[in-house]
């Protein structure tokens, strides 16, 4: 396989090829207007950033941090840092003061780049507690800088330190010295058990990952890739860099809450997403079907059935559809299914990689049935995203996570653990020798902590090994499987399954309050607060009955028998969620110990 150019110079190589073609579409902070930046302009800004970093005293292998939501400045900073051999460390925009203080001190960060007021305020408050930290550089010009803060500098003013490229000869020399073995990023994992470790990623890992993914993921310079997930997340970072490296036009969505509007305004052809996004799409479409006329419901259900037979039964298995089915699909696609995709802004869709959690089979079938090419995959921060994914040249199975990408050796070890070896796998965790010894087998395979199996070359996951529950009857429960089925329901927003050393499975449920409140009003349920709503027997009965319908495919011992409705969301602030919005089970179980015990009272 052909290797790609080093990340330190990739922006400039692409500018030579694509010139004034748009590289990025984005919105400035506080603006509702989409703007474009060409490859040439981006290359120039990256050079300015590299020069500015040297002028402010940065030296090769120094650490910088980026504490921001997605924005153009984020990418300028990253690639500017790569150009002068700095290590860029991304922080989630939602990270707490305690988290960023720990990461800054652990990695000995010198400069921190922040997005908006919230991130600046947190960085300013912990500045004195971080002895290596010298500068806070602010992306959003409207941020109010604290009085007497000599460390703060707006990004516009930071770039002025690089105007005219005064240190470009030194930058060019650093390009020549760039090595694939150099450290590129440290990504701190927000583990579901609370521990945070810095995953070391080198330029060589990126080179291997981009090369392998380009061989199996159908993205090209004809695509428009929407950046939806935080670029701090390795899945989004990997897919953004892949899209950029092949010359795709990248659309930067800054506010995740505006993603639906952004999609309708910009019509992307590609976007990486997590299963929860598609669950929400599925629920919204079903809600519209339910409110339609009987004739419209019948037509749509027929279209979905045709779409399922064409896209799932035939295309997914690489079977040729019959002439009649092909003609029937062409008709329903043109008259009905395309309208669904258009309403989502996905009528020009190419591929939509999906990973980060288990995809409910019902949701995966639905997405394919409406003609959206969901590419399900599996990966970790430690593997620089993709380990495996569905491929266009091979049959795929609903519920699987695809085939290993080129260069990745996957085998199943003790306890059915998925083990990995290959050029994209991290060399280890930053300053964590003990953790590094535990992370690898004696023969050099990385321990993923995920249980799974391989069938006909395709990888299937069971659950996180540490999450597997054993009931008091000796039966094993995979909570993510149960939760993924329950989350399909429109009345349920969050769920935490309980089963370990218990007689049966129960669940803590956070309702989708808007819809449950509407249902309650329609059915004469009186309530004055969310606490009243969650305590109401009629509401509890309705939700439990819906759960029983959803979990019919599960074995009897896997099925949820009792539920407790929680009147507020699991949150980052309470420590119940990681920055990637995964449930921290030990914290949730501790916070709701009383409610859990009540479910098991005789």
What is the predicted role of each segment?
Residues 404-471, 488:
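Conserved ATP-binding/catalytic segment of the ANL
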Residues 19-22, 137-138, 163-188, 195, ...:
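Conserved pre-ATP/AMP-binding loop-to-beta segment of ANL
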Residues 207-224, 231-334, 348:
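Conserved AMP-binding/adenylation subdomain of ANL enzymes
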Residues 56, 83-161, 542-548:
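Structural core segment of the AMP-binding/adenylate-forming
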